[in-house]
């Protein structure tokens, strides 16, 4: 025996049923009139993650590049873990790649060769791509990041790999984040904004090791005042960022240990910060 949409809503959700009756009343409908049941376009609930794109036009995954390719040489020189080659892309025509992926991006681009770093959200939706130039000069823009959606939310790299039940590390550079466990990257120096928007039990903010950079120093001071846990790099570390430390010969495990031993907050953070900064 069939039933009307109104009867069904009354049985399932009384609040929704009242809203439905009100909408009918506003439309001049009543119980004695003939009307067509409305169509509800309710999005399907999302269970788990989507599959990431398996191919892109005008680009190929670095894991598919032939041995000796100059892009692979770049990755090897940066000591990027091979496990991430299948997640990074190479294009010899960045403009063509972007024009196809995001036709109305509105940016003036050069059709040069770049390593492409895809940004995904927690559901594996592609939200942005960042192209790192492989051949640079004084006029080259090293990183060009393009959003693939209309969202104005802060871009964060690594959200697809994040486990909020473990300590979350926040760094600046996407490449830096590839060397640390459970790490995301802000793409800029405003790490605190990223940390504030991640719901995790414990978060550690890891600024670049630039004690003479006024902007970094200012942002670190703000993080300390907000009572965040941050890393104050020891004097024994001369490298500017995580990737430089790796290239200098420090292993990822050693860096993790250094981070753990130098994560501070509150008064201890302020005291160590005062000795660390050089401006």
Where are these regions (language model features)?
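Phosphate-handling DNA/RNA-contact segment within nucleic-acid enzymes
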Residues: 94-202, 216-217
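Short metal-binding segments enriched for Cys and/or His
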Residues: 1-13
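Generic detection of long, well-ordered alpha-helical segments
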Residues: 2, 61-68, 190, 210, ...
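TOPRIM metal-binding catalytic domain and adjacent DNA-binding surface shared by DnaG-type primases
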Residues: 11-115, 123, 225, 260-279
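TOPRIM fold recognition
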Residues: 127, 139, 165-168, 174-279
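N-terminal compositionally biased, intrinsically disordered segments and leader/signal-like regions
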Residues: 4, 40, 146-150
